[in-house]
Amino acid sequence: MAQKRFLLNEQDIPTQWYNIQADMPTKPLPPLNPATREPMKAEDLAEIFSMECSRQELDCEHAWIDIPEEVLDMYKYYRSTPLVRAYALEKALDTPAHIYFKNESVNPLGSHKVNSAIPQCYYCKKEGVTNVTTETGAGQWGAALSYAAKVFGLEAAVYQVKISMQQKPYRSLIMRTFGAMVEGSPSMSTRAGKDIVTRDPTHPGSLGTAISEAIELARTTPNCKYTLGSVLNHVALHQTIIGLEAEKQMEMAGEYPDKVIACFGGGSNFGGITFPFMRHNILEGKQTEFIAAEPNSCPKLTRGKFEYDFGDEAGYTPLLPMYTLGHDFKPANIHAGGLRYHGAGVIVSQLLKDGYMCGMDIPQLESFEAGILFSRTEGIIPAPESCNAIAAAVREAKKAKETGKQDVILFCLSGHGLIDMTAYDTYINGDLRNYTLSDEDIERNLGTLPQV
């Protein structure tokens, strides 16, 4: 019988993260101080982030960053995660393509997010921090951060996007189980939240609003740092453990991917699975395709603009060079809450601009159709976010059937959907719908970009 699952021995788990910035021909533009418009140094970023994460954020010299022993010890509780050949999905699609998925749903709390939550909390603890704050959409990051904070003895406060909190009530319960304070965003507990609610009392919340509130709380709480679940360079760095493992596992399978796919919100799991493979395109001229699957209701990669913008709605973050829909963009109430973000990470934005990858926009109904197919063939109910990656993989597998090519397709299953069943209920009952943005809506939002 052909092998289906590929696992690494504990001694083969990577001991370094891969920093693609060091190998990029065109380095990412620096973050700017929003007041002075001057490039920021690590010391400036460390006002809200841990010092070590701030250094990693701006490091364009070192391609390999050692994983601290304490972090590696925590990783070994659940890593490596399986690389799985999706034979049943291939059969259902009647495709010559070979489809593999990296199963991050088996991680603690059910997603890839813990891969960065652990090192971020470790660095905070090492630097004497006692409190951490963060934002979360669907709750995967908030749950992971709450868990990691408890492991390292930190107090955690989480602002969860209000509409996602309503759609997925058990995620906030998970966070509270680990001792975190959880509040829906926009809230009335911060100045940023009050301003947003005053302007729009029915605002459903966005990752941009939640980030504003989490940063404000971090700035006003003694001995507190802000942690982020995506977008920033150091988060993608930590997530490269995914792709580095997958490289070794694909070698065990005797194949190399022609296409690598992940869903896209801010870029953490996309960068995690793709960057280790992308370095071979950059350094060796390989021709692997890298596809970021984003919801077509939040199309920053496919319809956004490459400009400096804030990472949050209130304008508390540094100005970041990114593909953006505008920091005050109010996304539709889609169920892939982790993808409802206006901008793309700095590294991914530069790589897209330079042609190393592409975006693919996926309608919500198509994503759930693919998620149901995957559930019924592979026996795993995927997170709504991951459904976008599956939908993109299905498109590519169908394309392989048309051309007769035996493409090797690898995608990241970033999380399971067992706490997202209300979304599946809505889809199965026929009540789910697609959302689209008009060109006028996008242009109106882009009209509010800061002048740099």
Regions found by a protein language model. Give the residues of each.
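Short glycine/serine/threonine-rich phosphate/pyrophosphate-binding segments
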Residues: 114-118, 134-152, 166-169, 264-274, ...
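Alpha-helix C-terminal capping segments
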Residues: 119-129, 143-155, 176-177, 274-284, ...
